[in-house]
Amino acid sequence: QPENKPTETTPEPEPEPEPSEDAGDVYEAIRLINAERAKAGLAELTIDDDLMSMAAVRAAELPEKFDHTRPDGSDWKTVFGEFGVEVPYKRGENAGLGKDTASKQVNSWMNSSGHKANILKDNVTKIGVGYCYGDGAEKKNYWIMIVTN
């Protein structure tokens, strides 16, 4: 009978750091965005399932191309067609990078005039927020907010 000798094992690699527990809390981001709108006397935005799905798609694209242009070179608005939705007349997209919590990301957007303007648009009623933790060479937090009428 063969002897039961222990064999050498390759040590397990150290696990990569995971995002913080509240990272990517898209509903907290929406709550904070609506709080900023309330402070400005604007109506609350309602969560739209299609916009949530579109935002998830766009957030997942950001590690490949952090831009309002999609990885295939098309404009960000082409995501509407993928969901059978006509591009709304009133719309806006905010992209964010590196913030590990909803609070940090919304604060960052509120401290940027263009992003703040999208949050405080008075002619939009719906919102979707997406988040992606990029696990490529650069581990980063990616956020997308889409608002429409």
Please describe what each predicted stretch is.
Residues 37-39, 43, 87, 111, ...:
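Short, functionally important structural connectors and interaction interfaces within domains
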Residues 96-149:
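Disulfide-stabilized extracellular recognition modules
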Residues 19-65:
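A short alpha-helix/helix-coil micro-patch that ends at or immediately precedes a cysteine
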Residues 53-100:
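Short, surface-exposed glycine/acidic/tryptophan-bearing loops
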